[in-house]
Amino acid sequence: MSEYSIFTSESVSEGHPDKIADQISDAVLDAIIAEDKHARVACETLVKTGVAIVAGEVTTSAWVDLEQLVRDVIVDIGYNSSEVGFDGATCGIINIIGKQSVDIAQGVDRTKPEDQGAGDQGLMFGYASNETDVLMPAPIRFSHALVERQAEARKNGLLPWLRPDAKSQVTCRYENGQVVGIDAVVLSTQHNPDVKQSDLREAVMELIIKHSLPAELLHKDTQYHINPTGQFVIGGPVGDCGLTGRKIIVDTYGGMARHGGGAFSGKDPSKVDRSAAYAGRYVAKNIVAAGLADRCEIQVSYAIGVAQPTSISLNTFGTGKLGDDKIIALVREHFDLRPYAITRMLDLLHPMYRATAAYGHFGRTPYEMTVGADTFTAFTWEKTDKADALRAAAGL
């Protein structure tokens, strides 16, 4: 039986201030890694009324027109006029990026690439569950679907009075580990001042909520809270300061799994906060896809400058078809979780990261991208290409 009878997760749109910051940080990473695959990047962004501040540490041979890059991201999200409270074309851009510490570099860089040390100490978690088709928890999956649809309806002109900032929240009811109903839906969306609240609520219900959520899970007692405070005209960086790395639960499993605390956006793959969390998802998803367990959470930890993980632990919450200790042995046999090996296994040295910075890093569909002369697959950590080998090794 599921550990939870009711569980709630939330998501935010690409126009949420914290997500603007995440997307800018990852756009900077992409621009650098497109020219210098082995660059070291740690980029943080702050956005507030009329200004974007970009800071961090970078070691690279690449040159990036950072000001234009930041403006392009902001405008692309939808902040293109003072009428919506933020204008990427005219806002101030402050660049305070410096160089990476040589003390860190000496702990990471090695003559033999496979001996590359972790960029920092830390612990990372990966998770998967068979409750949805993408092996993600349903509450975060559905929450992402709502704000993705909000952005789609805004950008394609279906609901042209929508503005970029939005938040969603979904409460799911479980029986025996599977979702049997949605008990509550919250969707708050920024909008133009001239739209009537009654029209907004009807349109959001019919064209966003009902379009995004499985009809069979909505029932007569489902609670709907659409812009529950009423008017939501002032939003984005005018309403709230946005910072990189403040939506780490939205980025991962919606609280259904534990989190080591490290954010992803703006960090190159040498930072295990990001790459090892991606590897953890890859491992957990393949374990569930192989049928070794219905749910799986894995923890990996590292010491700065050391290649081998300091620990690997795993929990299948009583759903494993064999013991957790035996599954850990299979993980060690089939997955090399040293930092360089993760980068190679998941092919992470490509400019794929801005695409991860909104609507979740996990539960996405791998797809081919081309940037300049570089063609690669994004979201490789969502592949289940190890499932057959794991199943065979487990004797299932």
Swiss-Prot record:
GO terms for biological process: one-carbon metabolic process; S-adenosylmethionine biosynthetic process. PROSITE patterns: ADOMET_SYNTHASE_1, ADOMET_SYNTHASE_2. It is an enzyme of class 2 (transferase). Pathway: Amino-acid biosynthesis; S-adenosyl-L-methionine biosynthesis; S-adenosyl-L-methionine from L-methionine: step 1/1. PANTHER family: S-ADENOSYLMETHIONINE SYNTHETASE. Catalyzes the formation of S-adenosylmethionine (AdoMet) from methionine and ATP. The overall synthetic reaction is composed of two sequential steps, AdoMet formation and the subsequent tripolyphosphate hydrolysis which occurs prior to release of AdoMet from the enzyme. This is S-adenosylmethionine synthase. The lineage of its organism: Bacteria, Pseudomonadati, Pseudomonadota, Gammaproteobacteria, Pseudomonadales.
